[in-house]
Amino acid sequence: MQEFSLWCDFIERDFLENDFLKLINKGAICGATSNPSLFCEAITKSAFYQDEIAKLKGKKAKEIYETLALKDILQASSALMPLYEKDPNNGYISLEIDPFLEDDAIKSIDEAKRLFKTLNRPNVMIKVPASESGLEVISALAQASIPINVTLVFSPKIAGEIAQILAKEAQKRAVISVFVSRFDKEIDPLAPQNLQAQSGIMNATECYYQINQHANKLISALFASTGVKSNALAKDYYIKALCFKNSINTAPLEALNAYLLDPNTEYQTPLKITEIEAFKKELKAHNIDLENTAQKLLKEGLIAFKQSFEKLLSSF
């Protein structure tokens, strides 16, 4: 299925040197993503960073973080470069800008350009959150020919707006990361059983339609947050359900490994808009609104990445 790509949503030094290479070499994945929470988990819990951290003692916390993170990003970039050289739509690794800059467009643009210039790799995507000021950042980076991963996308309306900006201005590869499973985690406790474990897929599918109205060969929907939050669901539930044409799924290792045991052989047909609208109407009958939920989840996502980044910096 050439129009569906599987990426890995995980980064850690030992993994990059071993299992990451195996996944690439056997054709299981063709890209990867990182975020502040993943780096916090890796750097604070893995023994593979400790010697380097000791050598960097005395430097500012953010400088230590960037030294460690950029080394990992470069390593991932090198491993993925053959895929990029074969097909410039694949072979990317993403690095997020400082989450504390999300409400300052000018500083975000400056940091994004600095990081991209420092890394000096064509297959590095700079991640920008879909916040209010993020739209200005996306536009500026697109015009500067920087590959972009727009993250924390929950709202179909915002997904469409971002796709419209990128369709006009993107000169390099761009993906719009639609977060999936967090919807079900938020909504399922409030919804009757017959409506559970569906909100994330319904919302993601509507985002997919919005993105594809403007998508071109440079722009794709990327489904993120595709690890399950419920033990009642198969580990690869969201990967299989959202296996659409012209889409990417970035998955945590547990979901990825489960999917690889029994991968899809055909694309899924997305639900029709009429079916999605009928589902949303049923939710509203239970006082649940997906757009309001999307706004809430964006705020929570921005806070969570700041908390992870702060925890990581304070660990130094």
From Swiss-Prot:
UniProt superkingdom: Bacteria
Pathway: Carbohydrate degradation; pentose phosphate pathway; D-glyceraldehyde 3-phosphate and beta-D-fructose 6-phosphate from D-ribose 5-phosphate and D-xylulose 5-phosphate (non-oxidative stage): step 2/3
EC number(s) from the headed UniProt entry: 2.2.1.2
Enzyme class (EC, first level): transferase
Matching InterPro entries: Aldolase_TIM (IPR013785), TAL/FSA (IPR001585), Transaldolase_2 (IPR004732), Transaldolase_AS (IPR018225)
Locations listed in the record: Cytoplasm
Reaction(s) catalysed (UniProt annotation): D-sedoheptulose 7-phosphate + D-glyceraldehyde 3-phosphate = D-erythrose 4-phosphate + beta-D-fructose 6-phosphate
GO cellular component labels: cytoplasm
Cysteine pairings via disulfide bonds: none
Xref: CDD domains: Transaldolase_like (cd00955)
UniProt-listed PROSITE patterns: TRANSALDOLASE_1, TRANSALDOLASE_2
Family stated for the protein in its record: Belongs to the transaldolase family. Type 2 subfamily.
Name under which the protein is recorded: Transaldolase
Gene name linked to the record: tal
